[in-house]
């Protein structure tokens, strides 16, 4: 293993004993706003949170305060340990919205008709289409800090291209003074291409990590190697496997964290030095992989938030709550893996992907990088994370620029990757120190029909913390575009899918959506007659009766930004891996992520909304009639009951929202009762009539 083997030899030259974790922790411009309809959550506060909660102040004061706070970390390539140590004291990982009631921006009115027409004449058509009045108003009415809330299918990218065209056409900025930031390379490349085709100019459009890499390399050594995620994950995996095989105390701790059953089963044998790992035990292999995945994810978030194991101990002691003990054990397991990870890129003077933005912030703070931008545009702003926010903030403190952000709070679905919804909900509070903040909405969509717009909007807006938006389709077709299809068994649900596919046009484009990748198993297990050719690796599915039909399976997360004629939502069931998913979060990881929202299943609701809005013509809910999703009950009872004709739902548990199932009394077979399908988490029962 080369470097890794040398490092691990030094690390475990003697029997490894987890170190005990310490039991104690070391000691902008006024804008019109409107109160949120419901009281915001009361999250825990940190120094960073309190700073954001302060009243608006001048950019000069904000700049001096921020530089004073970050002075200890103003370096780019020096000791990772020192950087992490200073960061620990500031708890950078713990961004939480402030405990005061969040105030939301007032929607700006549209510009007068004559002004809109003048602006439209200057901009012209964008990608062969005229911009809407809402888009023109957002472009010409933009302030120093602008948030454009653009719903699904309303033309977010077109608005960004139009704004750049406006800046160039009016001579407000040159191409070199404009930066466009996106979250994926594919979207950044598409943005760059569309801007060039529309304006004839080359505008810098890149991801946050690409910008971070550019900053790091321009500030230090051009050829610093990138330590890719595959290599980093292998370092963590190899270190874990080595310790698991060669260290008794580490092995016992790992078994305990995997499962109490595994610990009971192997605890005696695991204390032997020549213990052989039970690799033929399915449960062991499954738990081991889950533990490795959790460790890799936690370490990546530690790096992206610039916090080390000592900082994690501090966070756990302050905010671990009932999970403090379990988190301590997880930290003991992760500590040597984290050191192996850090040593791997530090020895090679490399740049790891999770730490790329952290290093870039240091380069900006110490002045080794100077940016040339007057206008920065951010696409998909709802996906902003705390490290990305801090990079933008550091750039503005160095040399201010106008900020133009386009996003949709209804489609914020990446908390597990660090995205923080409060960065869009608290836009005014966060950015008003730099100047006036303004908000516009774009609500006209032609992607899907009004019936789906109304149902999906009513569904997502049951979370009252989100901005109110009223999307509409000007074509206003009256045909209903939602339908629930049910089945009590997998075979029944498979058959209703086949029946509907036979009714669709032979060249239709179709998405089969799941909450998890494993949801494709419905199609695989029931495909006994060979009706489909299924490629699990790509998700491509060929319906042999209609070979020209374009069918693809993917998860709801992966479908964001896509659209197809017809969508089948396969996972309308309850349970741990249902929709909403109720799989508990790793508590140690939760310390590194934004605060969980008070609205139950808030992000799962937004993810369900994203899944609903992928179709252009018709959406089919494939309902498990033995254990329907609680979202199905919500649609059935409160939003669109008419789509459930022919699909009867079982009674719903009033305690937890899961389905009730009819059961027979063991002592008296003639007596029956309803029990919650969420048992043992929910023990609700009621007598059957």
Model-identified regions with their sequence ranges:
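P-loop NTPase Walker
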Residues: 3-4, 8, 83-85, 90-233, ...
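Conserved RecA-like helicase ATPase core segment
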Residues: 386-479
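Conserved helicase C-terminal RecA-like lobe
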Residues: 505-509, 550, 554-613, 617-622
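Short cysteine-rich clusters marking metal-coordination/redox-active sites
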Residues: 653-656, 676
């Amino acid at each position: 293993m080369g470097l890794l083997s040398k490092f691990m030899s030094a690390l475990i030259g003697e029997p490894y004993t987890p170190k005990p974790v310490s039991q104690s922790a070391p000691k902008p411009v006024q804008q019109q706003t409107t109160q949120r309809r419901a009281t915001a959550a009361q999250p825990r506060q940190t120094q960073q949170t309190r700073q954001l909660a302060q009243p608006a102040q001048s950019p000069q004061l904000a700049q001096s305060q921020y530089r004073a706070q970050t002075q200890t970390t103003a370096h780019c390539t020096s000791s990772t340990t020192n950087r992490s140590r200073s960061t620990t004291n500031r708890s950078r990982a713990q961004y939480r919205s402030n405990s005061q009631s969040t105030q939301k921006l007032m929607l700006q009115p549209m510009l007068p008709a004559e002004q809109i027409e003048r602006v439209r004449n200057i901009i012209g058509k964008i990608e062969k289409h005229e911009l809407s009045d809402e888009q023109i108003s957002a472009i010409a009415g933009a302030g120093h800090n602008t948030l454009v809330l653009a719903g699904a299918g309303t033309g977010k990218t077109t608005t960004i291209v139009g704004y750049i065209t406006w800046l160039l056409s009016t001579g407000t900025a040159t191409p070199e003074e404009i930066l466009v930031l996106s979250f994926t390379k594919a979207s950044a490349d598409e943005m760059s291409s569309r801007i060039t085709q529309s304006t004839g100019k080359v505008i810098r459009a890149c991801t946050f990590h690409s910008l971070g890499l550019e900053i790091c390399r321009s500030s230090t050594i051009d050829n610093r190697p990138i330590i890719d995620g595959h290599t980093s994950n292998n370092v963590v995996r190899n270190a874990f496997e080595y310790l698991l095989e060669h260290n008794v105390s580490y092995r016992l701790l790992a078994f305990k964290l995997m499962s109490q059953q595994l610990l009971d089963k192997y605890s005696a044998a695991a204390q032997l030095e020549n213990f052989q790992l039970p690799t033929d035990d399915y449960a062991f292999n499954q738990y081991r992989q889950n533990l490795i995945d959790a460790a890799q994810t936690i370490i990546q978030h530690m790096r992206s938030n610039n916090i080390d194991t000592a900082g994690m101990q501090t966070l756990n002691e302050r905010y671990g709550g009932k999970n403090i003990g379990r988190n301590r054990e997880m930290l003991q397991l992760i500590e040597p893996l984290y050191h192996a990870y850090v040593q791997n890129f530090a020895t090679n003077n490399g740049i790891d992907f999770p730490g790329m933005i952290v290093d870039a912030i240091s380069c900006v703070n110490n002045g080794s990088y100077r940016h040339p931008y007057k206008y920065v545009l951010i696409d998909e702003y709802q996906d902003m994370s705390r490290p990305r926010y801090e990079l933008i903030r550091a750039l503005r403190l160095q040399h201010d620029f106008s900020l133009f952000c386009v996003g949709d709070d209804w489609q914020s679905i990446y908390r597990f990757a660090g995205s923080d919804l409060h960065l869009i909900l608290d836009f005014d509070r966060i950015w008003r120190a730099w100047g006036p903040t303004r908000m516009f909405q774009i609500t006209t969509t032609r992607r899907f029909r009004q019936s789906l717009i109304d149902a999906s909007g009513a569904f997502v807006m049951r979370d009252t913390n989100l901005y109110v938006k009223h999307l509409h389709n000007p074509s206003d077709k009256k045909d209903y575009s939602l339908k629930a299809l049910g089945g009590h068994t997998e075979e029944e649900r498979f058959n209703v899918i086949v029946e509907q596919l036979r009714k669709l046009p032979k060249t239709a484009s179709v998405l089969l959506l799941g909450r998890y990748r494993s949801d494709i198993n419905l199609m695989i297990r029931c495909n006994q007659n060979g009706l489909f050719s299924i490629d699990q690796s790509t998700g491509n599915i060929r319906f042999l009766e209609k070979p020209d039909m374009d069918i693809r399976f993917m998860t709801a997360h992966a479908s964001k930004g896509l659209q197809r004629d017809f969508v089948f939502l396969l996972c309308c069931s309850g349970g741990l891996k249902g929709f909403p998913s109720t799989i508990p979060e790793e508590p140690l990881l939760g310390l590194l992520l934004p605060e969980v929202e008070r609205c139950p299943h808030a992000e799962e609701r937004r993810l369900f909304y994203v899944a609903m809005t992928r179709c252009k013509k018709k959406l089919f809910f494939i309902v498990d009639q033995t254990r329907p999703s609680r979202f199905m009950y919500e649609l059935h009872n409160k939003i669109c009951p008419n789509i459930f004709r022919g699909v009867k739902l079982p009674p719903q548990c009033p305690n937890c929202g899961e389905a009730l199932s009819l059961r027979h009394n063991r002592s008296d077979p003639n007596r029956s009762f309803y029990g919650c399908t969420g048992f043992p988490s929910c023990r609700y029962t009621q007598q059957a009539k």
